[in-house]
Amino acid sequence: MASMMFTDCSSTTTSRLIHLNRSSGTFLLRQCVGQLRLQTTASGRGCCIRSSSSPISSISADTKSEGGAIVIDGKAVAKKIRDEITIEVSRMKESIGVIPGLAVILVGDRKDSATYVRNKKKACDSVGIKSFEVRLAEDSSEEEVLKSVSGFNDDPSVHGILVQLPLPSHMDEQNILNAVSIEKDVDGFHPLNIGRLAMRGREPLFVPCTPKGCIELLHRYNIEIKGKRAVVIGRSNIVGMPAALLLQREDATVSIIHSRTKNPEEITREADIIISAVGQPNMVRGSWIKPGAVLIDVGINPVEDPSAARGYRLVGDICYEEASKVASAITPVPGGVGPMTIAMLLSNTLTSAKRIHNFQ
């Protein structure tokens, strides 16, 4: 039995995974990306690729593969989504004179958090979304943060609010996140959004960005979810649990593996789809994987590498070298889920602006 130590693995607004770490939005246009139909043969080892008849055949033809597995290119998909968002932002501005706005609150001077905020601002600029930012000192009071949240809640030019995590230890993180207006909770962390996600017949206003990005990758590559066995490794509120809920909503049969799970490799070997989000480098080995399975790797883990310029390289939770020889499709690390997280944040912000202004 494998020994497992799970951590909170998030590639969204948190930076808990590593120090360097890194809706229900309905804006899910798929016609511009190569839709790959992945079909396992009777033996489960083969992978047949058919490109759709849409204008994406050129992307399908350029699809990369490694060790027999299709490489699910998160960078390419995220770029397509940003292009779609750019068009919609421009259309909204021209039609009703409204530009979607995203506000970020950063507390403290963590370099990794500052990098994430800078990347989000750059992403907003690239699609025409306005960005607002408040920076507070590490020793700021919780009341000061709540005041900033309240100000953005009341600002009609702000359609999405994001509190950069982690917050200083003297602050009640949940209390601050709960203060964000649910209509502007583009991170999807508000308990009411998660509660709606968990209930049949209810729709959350927003879905957390990283799990939403995972499912969107499956959609964009036309990978069937309905009726499939899916395993989510990790049960964090940020990635694992909402990812499991999303898969369940799409009629997959879902199992969750966590630090108390016995014989995780046996459970994982039954899965057609695996989403791993635990922050343990190369934990999932090739022997854990059912031939022909589809693998979505959320983990971003630094491992020492003297040959690398920075002295380390980034790897996922899944041993890529082994898994790519068994799976039918796999996300790389980096370049898989990471780019999708910010793309989904932009998508959620656009969705919020459209909803608030009743723009179709």
Curated annotation (Swiss-Prot):
CC per GO annotation: chloroplast
Cite a single GO MF annotation.
methylenetetrahydrofolate dehydrogenase (NADP+) activity
Species lineage: Eukaryota, Viridiplantae, Streptophyta, Embryophyta, Tracheophyta
User: Mainly localized where?
Assistant: plastid
Task: Please indicate if the UniProt record lists Hydrolase as a keyword.
Answer: yes
Family designation: Belongs to the tetrahydrofolate dehydrogenase/cyclohydrolase family.
Annotated organelle transit peptide span: 1-51
The name of this protein is Bifunctional protein FolD 4, chloroplastic
Task: Tell me which EC number(s) this protein carries.
Answer: 1.5.1.5, 3.5.4.9
Report keywords, A-Z.
Acetylation, Chloroplast, Hydrolase, Multifunctional enzyme, NADP, One-carbon metabolism, Oxidoreductase, Photorespiration, Plastid, Transit peptide
Q: How does it assemble?
A: Homodimer.
Q: In which pathway does it act?
A: One-carbon metabolism; tetrahydrofolate interconversion
Q: What is the originating organism of this protein?
A: Arabidopsis thaliana (Mouse-ear cress)
CDD domains from the UniProt entry:
NAD_bind_m-THF_DH_Cyclohyd (cd01080)
Q: Which domain of life is it from?
A: Eukaryota
Q: What does this protein do?
A: Catalyzes the oxidation of 5,10-methylenetetrahydrofolate to 5,10-methenyltetrahydrofolate and then the hydrolysis of 5,10-methenyltetrahydrofolate to 10-formyltetrahydrofolate.
Chain positions found as N-acetylserine: 52
Subcellular locations according to the entry: Plastid, Chloroplast
User: Pfam families from the entry?
Assistant: THF_DHG_CYH (PF00763), THF_DHG_CYH_C (PF02882)
Q: Name one GO biological process term.
A: photorespiration
Q: Which reaction is this enzyme known to catalyze?
A: (6R)-5,10-methylene-5,6,7,8-tetrahydrofolate + NADP(+) = (6R)-5,10-methenyltetrahydrofolate + NADPH; (6R)-5,10-methenyltetrahydrofolate + H2O = (6R)-10-formyltetrahydrofolate + H(+)
